[in-house]
């Protein structure tokens, strides 16, 4: 993790690291002379997705809509994603929605906060987690090995991410994802994410308020 300029500690808290990079054959192998640290304290807010969850459920066939959550860093995307996973996994009796098998791609350990194989956050009773693995590989492994109904993944944006999402969608798996951006226009400037937008992969897009953490700005249906 240090080579990616962060470490995740118990509880899903993340420490960003900058300093002098040690590079070998074009790859960062260490960071020396650390000059700054940025602490991001994880918090679970049970029920924070209740305001949007009904819009994400397809009650006609007891499934979920492919969803993208958009906001700048630090505005609550991961917190909302985590609670959506919990709701989808447990099921929502008032909506007549039975729980789904959810595969969580937790590359940086911020969603489930796994500790010795046990999630420290409540992510639901039907949830499988792969952590500390690059997102594309983890998505493919979950689809092949765990038969998820839904894949959840934080901070997508690379060409490899998009390829893995295409693979999951073609396998009949639904997806809940997050991406950095202030609005859809900003997201569409990412050439890879624009491909997913142009294909209309996302059936729901949630925009969070960039000025008030965790506050919903709008949902595109």
Model-assigned labels for residue ranges:
Residues 77:
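Conserved lysine of the Walker
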Residues 67-69:
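Hydrophobic anchor at the beta1->P-loop junction of P-loop NTPases
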Residues 89-139:
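P-loop NTPase switch/communication element
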Residues 80, 84:
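Hydrophobic positions on the alpha1 helix immediately C-terminal to the Walker A/P-loop
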Residues 10, 24-33, 203-221:
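Conserved P-loop NTPase
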Residues 146-206, 210:
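Conserved P-loop NTPase nucleotide-binding/switch module
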Residues 73-74:
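The conserved Walker
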Residues 1-63:
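P-loop NTP-binding catalytic core
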